[in-house]
Amino acid sequence: SAASCNKWWAEEILGTKDFAAEQAPIQKLGENHVFFLPYLMGERSPHNDPDARGVFFGMSMDTSRADMTQAVLEGVAFALRDSLEVAKSLGIKIERTKICGGGAKSPLWKQIIANVMNIKVDVLEVEEGPSLGGAMLAAVGCGVYPDVETAGKKLAKVVDTVEPTPELAAKYEERYQKFKELYPAMKPLFKNL
C-alpha cells in the first residue's frame, strides 16, 4: 500500500503511532529540499525493479525531522505521479483519483497528493481498498453490475474531495521534475547493495 512508507517512517524510525502529530510542524509545502525515494520493498510501477530501495536525498545540517517526514509524504505522492504519467502517455485522460485507508485520513497528505498529481482527490468511505476492488470485480463477474465503472459508482462512496491549488501544484511540478531524475541516477547502485 502507498501508506506503508508512512507507517514505516512513523513507527520504525520515529517510534510513534501518532503520525498526525509528526505532520503538524510541516509548514512549507512544495519548498522542501529533501527528497525520498519510497522504494522500501523494491518498485513495481512504473519501474519494475525489485532491487530499488528507499533513499533520502538532499539532506544538510539544516534538515529537520519535519523536513524528512514531509519528504516521505511527498516521495510516495511523486511515485504515484510516476504511474499517472504512464497512463497519460497511453492517452488516458485522468482528472481525478480516489484514495482510501489509513493514509486517506491525513488532511496534509491528501493535499500533497492533489497538488503533486494536479488532479482532484476523492476520499472514499471504505477503509480497505483491495477488498472493495475484489467485491467490485466479483459483482461484475456475477452480473450484478455490467462493468467496473458502474460498480465503482455504486459501491465507492466519496466522502471528501481535495482539489489542487494552482500555486502549490506549480511548486510541486518543479519538485517532481527533480524527483524523476533520482531513480535513473540511483538505479545502477541498487544492484550493488
Predicted segments — roles?
Residues 1-193:
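Active-site core segments that coordinate phosphate-bearing ligands/cofactors
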